[in-house]
From Swiss-Prot:
GO biological process terms held by the UniProt record: translation
Protein name: Large ribosomal subunit protein bL35
Gene name as annotated: rpmI
Organism listed in the record: Parafrankia sp. (strain EAN1pec)
Keywords: Ribonucleoprotein, Ribosomal protein
Family membership: Belongs to the bacterial ribosomal protein bL35 family.
């Protein structure tokens, strides 16, 4: 059976850690930042782990 290909859009949006957790970026930090507080934008910097509900689907798209 041939290898599964990674879904390229998913590959660009998610990162797999060494322990196998899937990390994602937070929304609301791309544009229209003028009216958002510094505190709010600062809290959106970090990547967060993907929710367990989405894990299986994203793993399949990442061919893992």
């Amino acid at each position: 059976m041939p290898k599964m290909k990674t879904h390229t859009g998913t590959g660009k949006r998610f990162r797999v850690t060494g322990t196998g957790k899937i990390m994602r970026r937070r929304a609301n930090r791309a544009h229209l930042l003028e009216h958002k507080t510094s505190r709010r934008t600062r809290r959106l910097y970090d990547e967060v782990p993907l929710s367990s509900a989405d894990n299986r689907r994203i793993k399949r798209l990442l061919a893992r």
